[in-house]
Amino acid sequence: MWDYTHRWSARSAIVLGLFLVVEATSGAILLYNAELFRASHSTFYHHTASADPIDAEQAMHIVTREHPDFAAGWVSPDGGILAVGSTDFSSAYAVDPGTGRINGKADLNGGVLGFLVNMHDCAFTCAGSPGTLSALTHPVPTLGMTWLADVTWGGAILGVLGLLMLFLGISGIILWWPTFARFSHGFRLRMKKGRYARDLDLHNVIGIVSIPFLLTWGITGAAFELPVVEKAWLAMTGGTAPDEAKFAFTPRQTATDAPTLSISDATSIAHEHVDGRTSYLTVPTPEADYYAVSMAGDYAPYGHRAFYSGDITVYVNSHDRDDVKVVDASHGQPLANTFYDKVFEPAHFGWLVSGWWRVVWFALGMTPLILMITGLSTWSFKRGVAKRRKAARS
């Protein structure tokens, strides 16, 4: 059993290799996506203090008035400004609430950060982002398996990578966890016993310490692309299959001459149903004639995300203030589902904690790179010893 596990662990490590290192390292960088975006767009985030700042409704009107060809679809308070974004979430104008002036326009999917997001989140399938490969956007053959429906080649790559990371974590527990007789050896660091002992101990200790995060990233990462993984996890932990219609909202019919609610009206209605701050709001469209108000409460698992930091959605019929639907994972489902939605999945991104605490996520996100370096070091050392012994025998 030990040799079998060791063999398959080694093979999966080879397959993961650079893919795992690139995926994990890019993910570690993207933990600070919001902070890096704000730092690299200082003019965009310029804002002034005012006793009477403008609100989201006014910001939307300012942008649509000055840029009538811009398809404004949402508005979000972020970093002191009011961002008015496009319907395809690709760009946004920043409005200074203190002066009502437009600071400028930003490409939300461009640059180095956009490339990293496209690589890490989409496997180069995000439309309109740098590096997109059209070949990876095609669906994979289902081979009669319904759970593969709508899965692209890019999604399959990410899903398999997540599953392999999960297997690597499980096999790592089997290989690295010490017996009770030599418990202390599993966490020792022989820093003065030579290169091989040092790197071997670093490999083992860092590996076992990072296991909880690797398992979390593996499960949630695979589940993003392969929903069957989430269903399996929830079934094992006492939950139920996710409600696929949870975020569907069909506004009821109203009189054709019924007045349209304003952004301020929709925001006020949302606050009547949910305590918290408004993260962002999408405006009605011909295809979806309602407001969607994303809210963040005291516990905000996505609270440190740029623009889209809410975890509770309030749908408001744009012509009927009494036609409202609240989607909150804290209510109406088993505890296992709530834990997954409110803790487990958000932990993948680290947005539930501040940037200082996210240093822990960053350090553990770099472990695949460290494990590769220490693994190569011990392998090259053993290979060198074997060569010298062979030469001595000959």
How should these model regions be labeled?
Residues M1-S394:
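Conserved histidines in hydrophobic membrane contexts and catalytic metal-binding motifs
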